[in-house]
Amino acid sequence: NEGQDRPALLITFDLDSDGTLRAFAPELSWVRVTANLTYIGVENEIATGAQGMLHHARDLARMLRQARICEHAVIMDQPDPRMVLKGDPANPEVEVVQSESTPEAQMIVSEFMILANKAMGSWARETGTAMLFRTQNITLPAESAGVWTEPTDIYRIINNMGPSILECEPRRHATIGAKVYAPVTSPLRRYSDFINMAQIMARLSGQGRLLDQGELESLLQLLSSRAELVGQVQRMRP
């Protein structure tokens, strides 16, 4: 879609020099896609040390991540393997390979998505807009906070973590380090984000059907069961 105009949810953030959120404002608008960036392309550009948009984005992402860790966030930096089929199509050989490491690019994407989801969770609570919230009301030892890369550490911490749940009441998400968290940034691949985006559009535009909390709660059982099945598949990945 490079060079095309696309509909978007724009969120303008006012941050101080430490990356602390002071104010934000969501709006529906059209944006022109200037370029289709890739993780590898972003990683390579940051590695050059050139001062520019991506360099500043990386610096902000670092501040956002550190602030979350101060709120006891637990970050699992796991490898991202890919399965490659080789040889005879009728009887292929399956090979598991590691994707090229792109930690800076992935940090930018994850931290900016989390910032947006936290902000829209707060917006939903402040405006009385019914939305689906991802919550995890657990208490972890203080030493669990931080970024973990070793498989043994990740396994140990995950075993002490309770699962996150989807609900209609805004509550904390412990391992993300958020007081409220409403997923909105992946409406093309997560049904919860799709529903939340529809709620945002209805509230901001005054058009379309705006569901109340009771109507959303009636969808929760189906959504939660599907999310649990997806989670099982993700946990069993190589």
Each language-model region and where it sits:
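Electropositive polyanion-binding surfaces
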Residues: 1-238
